[in-house]
Amino acid sequence: MNLNRFERYPLTFGPSPITPLKRLSEHLGGKVELYAKREDCNSGLAFGGNKTRKLEYLIPEAIEQGCDTLVSIGGIQSNQTRQVAAVAAHLGMKCVLVQENWVNYSDAVYDRVGNIEMSRIMGADVRLDAAGFDIGIRPSWEKAMSDVVERGGKPFPIPAGCSEHPYGGLGFVGFAEEVRQQEKELGFKFDYIVVCSVTGSTQAGMVVGFAADGRSKNVIGVDASAKPEQTKAQILRIARHTAELVELGREITEEDVVLDTRFAYPEYGLPNEGTLEAIRLCGSLEGVLTDPVYEGKSMHGMIEMVRRGEFPDGSKVLYAHLGGAPALNAYSFLFRNG
């Protein structure tokens, strides 16, 4: 496998830390050891997150092409768009963000706090759009790029989750290589890796990266899209393409992609009672914050897998904390009593 042939523009502090979740592990019976890899604090750029790791492999292309404007898309509380806005500010580029109405959630401050507030503070041109949630290329995003061209700029397109970009999976191939190095320092290997999946490139990169040591099927994606067929197909497509890019040496098959669909309900962006319990439990036991859209659902999934005995006793499980806590303010009504 050869990731080093791709140029990387450093936007993170370096390897994100792996920390034990001792109190949560003990609360759940102590038979499974839980750890977290903290992508939520991987950068000094507006709290970082998993998209910052991905952007390290996209930005060299933007610089090489002489682009002056990063154009991206997401929901109103998109972590992706906040991270793109931060990177644009860091590089001295302009930024146009299309923020679609992906979540059926009403709150008076939903479009004024959290991620979208930070994007505005960082100087992004934020455009609200009424379109609902879907995965893939969006007309509103294409129009935003056309607008940049019409006013004499040169846009660089960054799709939702970086996932439709040819290099969207590379960052999390790097994640797997980083984990392998950290495992040497820890003196053990993780038996399972749990990660939230929506647009697919995070899990796709992990599948490829861990396929290099035979652990692709140990990457357990927890769907948060509530459109699991689309998500799984996208993970597989991106993983196959990424495997070719890095010369993995074998084909990625459907069996390599494990996606748990039990925890996404009722729909994208809306938490269920299990999500909220997981957010409160992890916060109160570990001081680690997760969000109602992504990490709360994957944390719920991991907690339930432990409770149901789905991990063998003695397993060491790595939770990939991808970020997302900045969106908590947009859901403040749900936590008005804690």
UniProtKB/Swiss-Prot annotation:
Q: Does the keyword Hydrolase apply?
A: yes
User: Keyword annotations for this protein?
Assistant: Hydrolase, Pyridoxal phosphate
Q: What are the N6-(pyridoxal phosphate)lysine sites (modified residues) in this protein? A: K51
Q: Which residues form the active site?
A: S78
List, in alphabetical order, the Gene Ontology terms for molecular function in this entry.
1-aminocyclopropane-1-carboxylate deaminase activity; D-cysteine desulfhydrase activity; pyridoxal phosphate binding
Q: How does activity depend on pH?
A: Optimum pH is 8.0.
List the catalytic activities from the record.
Answer: 1-aminocyclopropane-1-carboxylate + H2O = 2-oxobutanoate + NH4(+)
Q: One of this protein's Pfam families, by short name?
A: PALP
Stated role? Catalyzes a cyclopropane ring-opening reaction, the irreversible conversion of 1-aminocyclopropane-1-carboxylate (ACC) to ammonia and alpha-ketobutyrate. Allows growth on ACC as a nitrogen source.
Q: Tell me what this protein is called.
A: 1-aminocyclopropane-1-carboxylate deaminase
Q: Which organism is it from?
A: Pseudomonas putida
